Regions:
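Compact, charge-rich alpha-helical regulatory domains located at protein termini
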Residues: 1-66
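P-loop NTPase motor core
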Residues: 110, 187-280
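Phosphate-binding/switch region of NTP-binding enzymes
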Residues: 234-238, 242-338
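Hydrophobic/aromatic beta-strand patches that form the interior of the parallel beta-sheet core
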Residues: 104, 139-141, 183-185, 256, ...
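Charged, alpha-helix-enriched surfaces in structured cytosolic catalytic cores
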Residues: 13, 46, 85, 101, ...
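Conserved, well-folded catalytic cores of nucleic-acid-processing
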Residues: 54, 58, 93-97, 109, ...
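The Walker A/P-loop phosphate-binding site
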Residues: 17, 36, 40, 51-167, ...
Length: 338
């Protein structure tokens, strides 16, 4: 049975535009390009994307057996899978590494190492499971134009050298394979990013070996350009977060997003840096890690986790894969704590 557009919580203006122009069911929306919907209905691209993300996310569940379930043991097995960060200390702080089926956010100022960590994770996802990898592939969504293939080659080269030393008989590990297994998609504006996220379920079905999705960064196209229409921005971000969380859970993959920092004024002559995109976005992420500078040293703080205590780690970025991100563990109160 086709689900009617009337059954969704849409503004009267959007609902009228859709129905009066022949878009009466989910299928009418899901199988048409955003540009065509805008041309037919007169909706702005942002409005059409908002509708598309909501109806396709719900429609993906249609036809499934609502009584299907997993046992507690199966869920425990799924949630016990982690992707190594290549640093034993950071993995320990996180409880094993980057968890699957969760939305993980890495925040920090420019130059602190967010992109470096993103690329490292893309390579790590291809490592055999006995070395903390996922035996899979990765998708990197680049919004800032900061992807440089030479940096990925350097990390892949270190990974290959590391694996060859650990197990000379290991197969299917080559530079060509490492690069082919990282699917890169560049998004030039936020509407393109939203469209890519909307189409991710289909892409994952076609590329079933993908075990990691990285968005670097989630905030780049959302910091400006909304003309103070922050309610629209919040709706789009929340819809995007819900889609990513759903993907992580249904496809048993790791989802990592990077975020920038912004200045918060807390007094006449006092301010400090906080993650961009506001509190609503922060509540959507399962885990939040903040990278920052202090006394010319890099620090990382695990600020939010449902099962781990807050911890601060001093780190430096080095060359070798088995020490690509060298962390020194310390426990103290975070400067970002409430």
């Amino acid at each position: 049975m086709l689900r009617s557009i009337d059954s969704y919580l849409l503004s009267p203006h959007v609902r009228y535009r859709l129905i009066s122009n022949g878009y009466t069911t989910v299928e009418d929306i899901a199988h048409n390009p955003v540009e065509e919907i805008c041309e037919d209905t007169g909706l702005f691209k942002e409005e059409a994307l908002d509708v598309l993300m909501n109806v396709t996310a719900d429609n993906e569940d249609s036809g499934r057996n609502v009584l299907s379930s997993n046992t507690a043991f199966q869920l425990l097995q799924q949630e016990s899978l982690y992707l190594t960060t290549t640093c034993h200390k950071l993995d320990d702080v996180l409880g094993g590494g980057i968890p699957l089926m969760k939305l993980v956010e890495i925040c920090g100022s420019p130059g602190i190492g967010k992109t470096q960590m993103s690329l490292q994770l893309c390579i790590n996802s291809q490592l055999p499971k006995q070395y903390g990898g996922l035996d899979g592939e990765a998708m990197l969504i680049d919004t800032e134009g900061s992807f440089v293939v030479e940096r990925l080659i350097d990390i892949a080269s270190a990974a290959i050298n590391f694996l060859s030393l650990q197990d000379p008989k290991i197969q299917n590990i080559s530079m060509d394979n490492m690069l082919k297994n990282v699917h890169v998609r560049q998004c030039k504006d936020y509407s393109e990013l939203l469209a890519v996220i909307t189409l991710l379920p289909e892409f994952l079905r076609e590329h079933s070996k993908i075990r990691l999705i990285v968005i670097d960064s989630i905030s780049f196209h959302f910091r400006y350009g909304f003309d103070k229409n922050y309610s629209l921005r919040t709706r789009l971000l929340c819809g995007m977060a819900q889609s990513l969380i759903k993907l992580a859970s249904e496809y048993n993959i790791a989802v990592v997003v990077t975020n920038q920092m912004t200045t918060k004024i807390i007094g006449p002559n006092k301010s400090h840096l906080i993650p961009s995109l506001g509190e609503s976005w922060g509540h959507m992420c399962t885990i939040r890690i903040i990278l920052y500078w202090k006394e010319n040293k890099r620090w990382a703080v695990l600020l939010k986790s449902p099962w781990r205590e807050e911890a601060i780690i001093q780190f430096q970025i080095t060359v070798l894969l088995n020490n690509q991100l060298s962390f020194h563990l310390q426990f103290r109160k975070s400067p970002f704590s409430a």
